[in-house]
Amino acid sequence: MVAQAAPPAGTAGQGTHEAASAAHGAAAAHGAAEEGHGKKSHFPPFDATTFASQLLWLVLSFGLLYLLMSRVALPRIGRILEERHDRIADDLEEAAKHKAESEAAQASYEKALAEARAKANAIAGETRNRLAADSEANRKSLEAGLAVKLATAEQSIASTKTEALTHVRGIAVDATHAIVSTLIGSSPAQSDVEKAVDVALVKKDAA
């Protein structure tokens, strides 16, 4: 039999090393697969092994948020609130100013109204007094005129009455003289007849 030649020593050693590495990799993969099948899966936020990193990121996030709020958002909000407060204060001051002006105008109007009312009452009183004085003067003038007219009328009546009585006396004297002459058959004295008529007229006026 012809003997086969042996492979070189370096080639044989290299093949053996590669085979060992492949076997180790397969064993590691098999072990990892078995370990993965043997352990339970967890929700990442609830995984206790990641708590430290989660707390770190939480602190960093809140720190950045606080820095952003304190440097950007809060100053803006503060300025807005301050501007709003100043605007409200200005509006309140303006409203108070308008209120004071309105109250002053109302007081001035009421004062002017009271003065006008007092002046109107004074004018009305003066007018009433003047009309009363004029009416009194007219009344007195009318009464004086009526008194004069009444006196004139009384004088006229008295004169007419006197004249009428004179005629009546003459008629009475003539009638009495005729009656007495007829009764006694003689003519009485004229003076006696006139005296008798005058006595009769006086008694009549007294009655």
Swiss-Prot record:
Region feature (Disordered): 1-41
Keyword Membrane: yes
Keywords (A to Z) from UniProt: ATP synthesis, Cell inner membrane, Cell membrane, CF(0), Hydrogen ion transport, Ion transport, Membrane, Transmembrane, Transmembrane helix, Transport
Compositional bias per record (Low complexity), positions renumbered to this chain: 1-31
Protein's membrane topology: Single-pass membrane protein
InterPro entries from the UniProt entry: ATP_synth_b/b'su_bac/chlpt, ATP_synthase_B_chain
Disulfide topology: none
GO cellular component: plasma membrane; proton-transporting ATP synthase complex
Subcellular location: Cell inner membrane
Source domain of life: Bacteria
GO MF: proton-transporting ATP synthase activity, rotational mechanism; proton-transporting ATPase activity, rotational mechanism
CDD domains: ATP-synt_Fo_b
Broad class of the protein's primary localization: membrane
Family that this chain belongs to: Belongs to the ATPase B chain family.
Function: F(1)F(0) ATP synthase produces ATP from ADP in the presence of a proton or sodium gradient. F-type ATPases consist of two structural domains, F(1) containing the extramembraneous catalytic core and F(0) containing the membrane proton channel, linked together by a central stalk and a peripheral stalk. During catalysis, ATP synthesis in the catalytic domain of F(1) is coupled via a rotary mechanism of the central stalk subunits to proton translocation. Component of the F(0) channel, it forms part of the peripheral stalk, linking F(1) to F(0).
Stated name of the protein: ATP synthase subunit b 2
Organism of this sequence: Xanthobacter autotrophicus (strain ATCC BAA-1158 / Py2)
